[in-house]
């Protein structure tokens, strides 16, 4: 396994003598030499050709192409000369070597591709060269990115000696000898969100949940007036709806306009809270025997005026439900599970037209963040003696925040703050307050959703007036970098769902089809 050898500095004419036979190198060939070539019995040297010369005999053992005008070697370029033992390209415009370019050259021992324009070599270009003794690629402007990783791997496993020259980019390896690169120098695994399935309806929210060992998803359909529950269909390999709330046999209230449905499993029972702008908000219970949902209770009929968002959580063993109320005279209300239903526990933040509520823990303390259209986001913390949330602080310099989503990274708590126009922000909790980390431009944004998929961390900023932006966290800089665009019309929610070792991202669209993307892994060196 060498990257240099006894032939590395050997003069080319010596190799030609060894391959062609020194005593017979001037003997006239028995075949007609192409007009652009000079030929002996076993050798051909061709100058300024526009391609691999045709008409060469199959028993030629040495071929040299100098100052050629063609730019690529295609598959099977030398099938007519299977006896070649030495092949040379030099001082030409050759820039691309495709897969299987040298197929059929079972006897080739010396391959010189020097001082050309080659920036990369296809992964299977050298396939079939089992007898190769020496490879020389010096003098080429190699771009040492993932497309060249295979060559570094090949060098570590071959017995052939090699001279490869130096990298001409990218920046971090510019000027490095290609022979000094190692596999760990390449980061060639990336990811993408690929469209997997479209659902023919508009949606506002997407809520994944676990029930009986399977993951499901609840989707709010405002124009259809219902909440649909979807599961993975193992036979069709796609998601399908298996139940609906506010659908036949239950009549749809006129103008009900559901805005959120929140599934939760309480005491082993599946409940779904359906918040509506009209017709009342209700709690529904799944009945296994009948395979449908039945209405359990109306939720706070005297308290909820214009619900906009829901959050469910557990504190000190109790289940709570928070309903953000966006009416001018309303108040965000906290309900507690009492065994047979949810009952009002605390009123928060009256008269501020709250648009979103997020539950999180700050330094181990249960907390709520309320986003409002009339003031900065407010942080509440749980008081155990009073069994209530008390105002703790607000988030500075962030008026008109529509929604708040949080995530944890390396022990720190971050929030994604959504603004419709201007800049949405990522902020980090630093003991007593949130501080800026990063700004992202919003173009009609109503959702800024952090997503954790495997070891990858993303943040998706939905835009009504441009493409939605997927950002991926870069551990080296500690920032999110723009990664991909999604063409989802008027997105209102993004959610991650894992099914049988496959990861999906649901994108709820308010004006078009709701879309499901599959998270895929791509090897850029393949």
Report each predicted region and the residues it spans.
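Repeated scaffold domains used in trafficking and secretory/extracellular systems
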Residues: 201-208, 253-262, 303-312, 352-359, ...
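Entry beta-strands of beta-propeller and related beta-repeat scaffolds
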Residues: 212-218, 267-273, 316-322, 363-369, ...
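Structural motif
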Residues: 225-231, 279-285, 329-336, 375-381, ...
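Extracellular leucine-rich repeat
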Residues: 2-192, 207-210, 229-241, 262-265
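Beta-propeller domains
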Residues: 194-196, 214-246, 278-288, 332
């Amino acid at each position: 396994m060498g990257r240099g050898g006894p032939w590395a500095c050997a003069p080319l004419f010596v190799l030609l003598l060894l391959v062609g036979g020194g005593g017979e190198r001037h003997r006239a060939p028995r075949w007609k030499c192409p007009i652009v070539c000079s030929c002996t019995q076993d050798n051909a040297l061709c100058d300024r050709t526009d391609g691999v010369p045709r008409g060469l005999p199959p028993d030629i053992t040495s071929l040299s192409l100098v100052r050629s005008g063609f730019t690529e070697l295609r598959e099977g370029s030398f099938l007519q000369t299977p006896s070649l033992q030495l092949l040379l390209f030099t001082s030409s415009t050759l820039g691309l070597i495709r897969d299987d370019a040298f197929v059929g050259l079972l006897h080739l021992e010396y391959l010189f591709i020097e001082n050309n324009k080659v920036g990369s070599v296809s992964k299977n270009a050298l396939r079939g060269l089992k007898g190769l003794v020496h490879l020389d690629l010096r003098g080429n402007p190699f771009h040492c990115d993932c497309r060249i990783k295979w060559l570094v791997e090949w060098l570590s496993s071959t017995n052939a000696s090699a001279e490869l020259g130096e990298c001409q980019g990218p920046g971090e390896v510019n000027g490095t000898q290609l022979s000094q690169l190692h596999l760990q120098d390449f980061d060639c695994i990336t990811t993408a969100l690929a469209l997997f399935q479209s659902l023919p309806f508009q949606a506002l929210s997407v809520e994944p949940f676990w029930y009986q060992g399977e993951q499901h998803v609840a989707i709010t359909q405002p124009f259809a007036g219902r909440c649909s529950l979807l599961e993975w269909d193992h036979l069709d390999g796609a998601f399908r709806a298996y139940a609906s709330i506010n659908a036949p046999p239950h009549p749809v209230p006129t103008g009900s306009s559901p805005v959120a449905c929140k599934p939760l499993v309480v005491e082993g029972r599946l409940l779904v809270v359906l918040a509506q702008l009209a017709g009342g908000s209700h709690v529904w219970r799944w009945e296994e025997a009948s395979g449908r949902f039945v209405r359990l209770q109306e939720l706070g009929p005297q308290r909820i005026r214009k619900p906009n968002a829901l959050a469910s959580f557990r504190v000190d063993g109790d289940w709570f439900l928070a309903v953000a109320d966006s009416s001018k005279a309303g108040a965000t209300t906290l309900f507690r599970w009492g065994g047979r239903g949810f009952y009002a526990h605390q009123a928060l933040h009256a008269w501020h037209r709250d648009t979103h509520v997020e539950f999180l823990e700050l330094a181990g303390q249960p907390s709520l963040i309320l986003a409002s259209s009339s003031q900065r986001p407010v942080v509440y913390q749980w008081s155990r003696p009073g069994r209530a949330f008390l105002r703790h602080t607000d988030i500075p310099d962030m008026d008109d925040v529509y929604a708040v989503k949080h995530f944890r990274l390396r022990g720190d708590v971050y929030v994604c703050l959504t603004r419709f126009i201007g800049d949405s922000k990522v902020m980090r909790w630093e003991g007593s307050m949130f501080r800026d980390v990063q700004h992202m431009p919003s173009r009609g944004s109503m959702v800024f959703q952090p997503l954790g998929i495997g070891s990858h961390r993303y943040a998706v900023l939905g835009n009504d007036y441009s493409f939605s932006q997927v950002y991926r966290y870069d551990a080296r800089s500690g920032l999110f970098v723009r990664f991909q665009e999604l063409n989802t019309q008027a997105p209102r929610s993004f959610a991650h769902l894992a099914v049988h070792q496959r990861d999906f991202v649901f994108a709820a669209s308010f004006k078009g089809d709701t879309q499901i993307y599959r998270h895929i892994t791509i090897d850029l060196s393949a």
